[in-house]
């Protein structure tokens, strides 16, 4: 797995650093041949792979240009983030009010610049990775940049 959530958190299901690089190399090759339109998701900054494995450079758009209403009515900045990051419920809260006033943690990510991100040389490109890669304490669960460039 690439995204360590749910059953994917099991270390037995995690891909190795070598497999991860192989996956990205495969995506690059497929995009060059144009036989398959392969694209890597918003799983964080990828260094030299940026511009080669997806149609845009990495940004986490959760709360910036993306908001979601989930099946239970929860208002979330992204369907992939943890429920403790939800900012309201459509049955109780005004969506526009939530969008305008409660998504600040997504728009100002300085709170993420801690632990392994505190002194990261690519912070200005990464901004702490995707919100879905944070645990309930805000700690980063996975850094794909580190996975590639240890």
For every predicted segment, state its role.
Residues 1-76, 80-86:
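Radical SAM enzyme [4Fe-4S]-AdoMet core and its adjacent flexible, acidic
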Residues 80-150:
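Flexible mid-to-C-terminal extensions adjoining Fe-S/redox cofactors in radical SAM and related proteins
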């Amino acid at each position: 797995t690439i995204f360590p959530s749910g059953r994917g958190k099991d270390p037995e299901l995690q891909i190795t650093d070598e497999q991860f690089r192989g996956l990205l190399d495969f995506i690059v090759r497929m995009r060059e041949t144009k036989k398959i339109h392969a694209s890597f998701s918003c799983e964080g900054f990828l260094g030299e792979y940026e511009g080669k494995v997806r149609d845009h450079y990495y940004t986490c758009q959760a709360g910036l240009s993306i908001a979601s209403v989930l099946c239970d009515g929860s208002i979330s900045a992204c369907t992939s983030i943890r429920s403790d990051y939800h900012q309201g419920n459509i049955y109780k809260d005004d969506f526009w009010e939530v969008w305008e006033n409660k998504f600040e943690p997504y728009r100002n990510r300085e709170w993420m610049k801690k632990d392994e991100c505190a002194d990261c040389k690519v912070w200005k490109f990464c901004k702490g990775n995707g919100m879905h890669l944070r645990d309930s304490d805000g700690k980063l669960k996975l850094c794909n940049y580190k996975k590639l460039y240890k």
